[in-house]
């Protein structure tokens, strides 16, 4: 069974917290991008690719704070933000990508790569603006998959389902 790894679950929890903090009715791709780039693992990957992570965070936060007034909740009562259709597409795409690569889990990198397909989103715009290269990320995921499979084949710890 394909499932999200623990790090990805934390990303989604933090995405919801970012939306709640701003009283947004919806969790958007931009909330997810913000949670991703604030995550130490993804932040380190982006830093290794020479991305100015601080500038990316600032751009996404500015967007969420100033351009999303139409999704601010009207009432004062606590509410749980809902996922947008584009966020559902993003997650489905990431799960499909992991499945086709023969992996048993979906990672934060899968979600980050999937953002590029949402061409009309500000999240994809910000990634391109900050010169995040989709192919570099895909190559990194592929390399990690090959290394994991090699370890399992050499008597290393087998991945679930590889017995």
Model-flagged regions — what are they?
Residues 1-163:
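Histone-fold recognition with a strong bias for associated Lys/Arg-rich disordered tails
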């Amino acid at each position: 069974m394909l499932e999200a790894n623990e790090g990805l679950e934390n990303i989604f929890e933090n995405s919801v917290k970012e939306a709640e903090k701003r009283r947004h009715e919806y969790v958007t791709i931009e909330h997810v991008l913000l949670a991703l780039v604030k995550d130490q693992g993804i932040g380190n990957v982006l830093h290794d690719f020479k991305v100015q992570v601080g500038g990316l965070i600032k751009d996404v936060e500015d967007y969420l704070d100033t351009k999303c007034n139409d999704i601010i909740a009207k009432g004062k009562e606590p509410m749980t933000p809902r996922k947008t259709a584009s966020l559902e597409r993003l997650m489905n795409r990431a799960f499909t990508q992991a499945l086709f690569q023969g992996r048993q889990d979906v990672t934060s990198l899968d979600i980050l790569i999937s953002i590029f397909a949402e061409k009309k989103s500000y999240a994809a715009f910000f990634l391109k603006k900050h010169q995040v290269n989709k192919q570099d990320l895909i190559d990194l995921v592929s390399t990690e998959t090959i290394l994991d499979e090699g370890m399992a084949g050499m008597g290393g710890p087998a991945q679930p389902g590889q017995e």
